[in-house]
């Protein structure tokens, strides 16, 4: 009997999920994920966004060049884009997927974000903390716009 060799492939991790309630309707909240001027108010220092399937998704988030492309854009209900860090060997540009759902609840919007395909638990933990923090900022920004 020979001992098994540990796999060198990263194990898939559970998706990161975060949800917030924003005091504004979905048509006010949705553009914060598609309009570069609004993205720089809550998550990025600079943004280049072409919000159509196949369009560029590029944010500079605290010195990290997040890069990908829009996969689905269904205003004001759902947006999905690929995500990764330009130049990263562990999480290359476009190798994970972020889905954001916008659900009207009275005059508010419940935003539910799911980030899939992160390669390691360390990336999962850092992205969970990051998304939770940035969505908290979004609550104040988009809520004041509604």
Where do the language-model regions lie?
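Short Gly/Pro-enriched turn/cap motifs at secondary-structure boundaries
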Residues: 10-11, 59-61, 91
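Short beta-edge strand/loop motif at the mouth of beta-sheet-based domains
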Residues: 17-18, 24, 36-69, 78
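A conserved amphipathic terminal alpha-helix motif
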Residues: 2-3, 117-146
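Short acidic N-proximal helix/loop "leader" segments that mark the beginning
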Residues: 1-17
